[in-house]
Regions:
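Conserved alpha-helical "signature site"
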Residues: 1-163, 167-246
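Short, intrinsically disordered, charge-balanced linker/junction segments flanking boundaries
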Residues: 176, 252-257
Length: 257
């Protein structure tokens, strides 16, 4: 990556509002509802309808939450406070994430949907394997592709080259990013997470979600996010990176899958 491009990307990341500023809007709204005198269980983190709304905004029925299983929305497992904090974070991030990513061929709403489906998939996998931090799994899944929001602006200028490289069939979009820029959306996403002050394990999960074998701090978390991403893509919940399925790691024995 040229020094000029690196400076442009770093400048764009540095100009992002601090995550505390983004989240404060949601937290202030939650506090105002609490001060309204209405029962706390009817709002925000304790509201089953709040969680259900998240699921209804995605294609999560694909995973079995449909029909006569609608009651699953209100299970104690899903309504655990750890996961609901992640749901609040999702609402905090929605304005930032819910946008068209032209270079990646994603219309408005598609990137948000994929991010949410990956977050929910990561939560399900983490629950299945008794991972000890469901909130971290949810958040890492939610933010795994956040670097695309930054890179899309620069990739749009190289859209023709990007399409030409990936259309050959043997080069993945991630490899195409590296060919064009010398960096990929995963690395940029890790920098965004660090800028926002997220746990280093989340930064690693973002950085390594295409290459889980490179994980050092928390290989289980990285593998969970990698698998969640692959599941979401394989079910048609993203229009790009379909070749990612071919990269699905075969050894998940450490997770007990």
């Amino acid at each position: 990556m040229s020094e000029k491009l690196a400076n442009k990307i770093n400048d764009k990341i540095e100009k992002l509002p601090r995550f505390s500023q983004i989240a404060d809007k949601a937290l202030i709204a939650e506090k105002e509802r609490s001060l309204s005198g209405e029962p706390s269980e009817d709002h925000g983190l304790h509201d089953p309808k709040f969680a259900k709304q998240i699921l209804q905004m995605t294609n999560f029925t694909t995973y079995g939450f449909a029909g006569n299983r609608a009651g699953s929305f209100e299970t104690e497992a899903f309504l655990g406070e750890d996961v609901l904090r992640g749901v609040l974070l999702a609402f905090s991030l929605r304005e930032f994430v819910d946008r068209e990513l032209h270079a990646y061929g994603l219309g408005k709403g598609e990137f948000w949907e994929h991010s949410m489906n990956c977050a929910l998939s990561a939560w399900m996998i983490a629950t299945k394997v008794a991972y000890d931090d469901l909130e971290m799994a949810f958040v890492a899944g939610l933010m795994h592709d956040i670097g695309k929001v930054i890179l899309d602006e620069f990739l749009s200028e190289e859209r023709e080259k990007f399409v030409d490289i990936t259309s050959q069939g043997y080069v993945t979009p991630v490899e195409a990013e590296r060919t064009i820029f010398g960096v990929d959306h995963a690395e940029i996403g890790a920098q965004v997470a660090a800028h926002w002050g997220f746990d280093e394990k989340i930064s690693e999960a973002i950085r390594c979600h295409h290459e889980p074998e490179l994980a050092v701090q928390d290989p289980d978390l990285v593998t969970i996010v990698h698998l969640a991403d692959c599941i979401s893509v394989s079910l048609g919940l993203a229009t790009q990176e379909k070749s990612l399925i071919g990269l699905l790691s075969s050894d998940f024995s450490g997770l007990g899958l």
